[in-house]
């Protein structure tokens, strides 16, 4: 089950949170969800070169707050803040409410699953060998603190006639452990041969809930009680037991008392 289910949806109630954080009644839910999907698609195209990892949309009291996580915040803001003002105006036109845009910097882009997937797809579109791109991304992630990473590519890899799937893993990726912080993302590379899909799982350690607090490993002793050696606790030895280490137990060897051929006892 842990291998098939979406890692983020599997951990929503334990260690992950929603990307859209708002409440709506049955009449408005579909329209607001469609707005969120349109906003994410627009930001993905508009900020294609800004290395955007994720987008969080909140709707407090007839307003909208959009938080963009990017490893290159300067590209999003633009010269003297011109680009972000144009972005805010377009988002207000699309959503119909006042929009506040916040930019958060991703400190380690090499361990962000979405940025890893986007980087691999960009290399595939530039005709770089998929194995080289995948292994380089895995090495960078492990070097910067990831405890495990798994990358899967599927499609007409290297332009072959028959599509296939290849994946590589390094370290641990416990998909069925709920407290494990698994960052999962997908991306698509549109090549001349067709579409190649890329999936990335990054294991960053265990957490204690949605605040991303790391788990402190405690040293646990053996729970089994040790028996105190007492003089009368040992069971008595039976005949033939004991002796020097390596000594054979039991009776005499078979044929030990018989004389050898051609020899008789005197």
From Swiss-Prot:
GO terms for biological process: translation. Residues 214-266 are annotated as: Disordered. One of its GO terms (cellular component) is cytosolic small ribosomal subunit. GO terms for molecular function: mRNA binding; rRNA binding; structural constituent of ribosome. Transmembrane segments: none annotated. Residues 230-241, 257-266 have a biased composition (Basic and acidic residues). It comes from the Bacteria. Keywords: Ribonucleoprotein, Ribosomal protein, RNA-binding, rRNA-binding. Residues 39-107 form the KH type-2 domain. CDD domains: KH-II_30S_S3. Signal peptide: none annotated. InterPro entries: KH_dom (IPR004087), KH_dom-like_a/b (IPR015946), KH_dom_type_2 (IPR004044), KH_sf_prok-type (IPR009019), Ribosomal_S3_C_sf (IPR036419), Ribosomal_uS3_bac-typ (IPR005704), Ribosomal_uS3_C (IPR001351), Ribosomal_uS3_CS (IPR018280). Belongs to the universal ribosomal protein uS3 family. Binds the lower part of the 30S subunit head. Binds mRNA in the 70S ribosome, positioning it for translation. Part of the 30S ribosomal subunit. Forms a tight complex with proteins S10 and S14. This is Small ribosomal subunit protein uS3.
């Amino acid at each position: 089950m842990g291998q098939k289910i979406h890692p983020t949806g599997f951990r929503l109630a334990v260690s992950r949170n929603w990307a859209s954080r708002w409440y709506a009644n049955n009449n408005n839910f579909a329209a607001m969800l469609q707005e969120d999907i349109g906003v994410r698609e627009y930001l993905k195209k508009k900020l294609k070169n800004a290395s955007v990892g994720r987008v969080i949309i909140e709707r407090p009291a007839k307003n909208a707050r959009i938080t963009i996580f990017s490893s290159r915040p300067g590209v999003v803001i633009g010269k003297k803040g011109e680009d972000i003002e144009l972005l805010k105006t377009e988002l207000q036109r699309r959503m119909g409410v006042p929009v506040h845009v916040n930019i958060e910097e991703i400190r380690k882009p090499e361990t962000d699953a979405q940025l890893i997937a986007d980087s691999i797809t960009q290399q595939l579109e530039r005709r770089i060998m998929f194995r080289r791109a995948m292994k380089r991304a895995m090495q960078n992630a492990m070097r910067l603190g990831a405890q495990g990473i798994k990358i899967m590519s599927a499609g007409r890899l290297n332009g072959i006639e028959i599509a296939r799937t290849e994946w590589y893993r390094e370290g641990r990726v416990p998909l069925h452990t709920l407290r494990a912080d698994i960052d999962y993302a997908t991306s698509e590379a549109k090549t001349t041969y067709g579409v190649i899909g890329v999936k990335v799982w990054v294991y960053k350690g265990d957490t204690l809930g949605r605040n991303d607090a790391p788990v402190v490993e405690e040293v646990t002793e053996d729970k089994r009680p040790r028996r105190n050696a007492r003089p009368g606790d040992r069971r008595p030895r039976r005949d033939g037991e004991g002796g020097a280490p390596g000594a054979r137990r039991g009776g005499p060897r078979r044929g030990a008392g018989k004389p050898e051929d051609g020899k008789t006892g005197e």
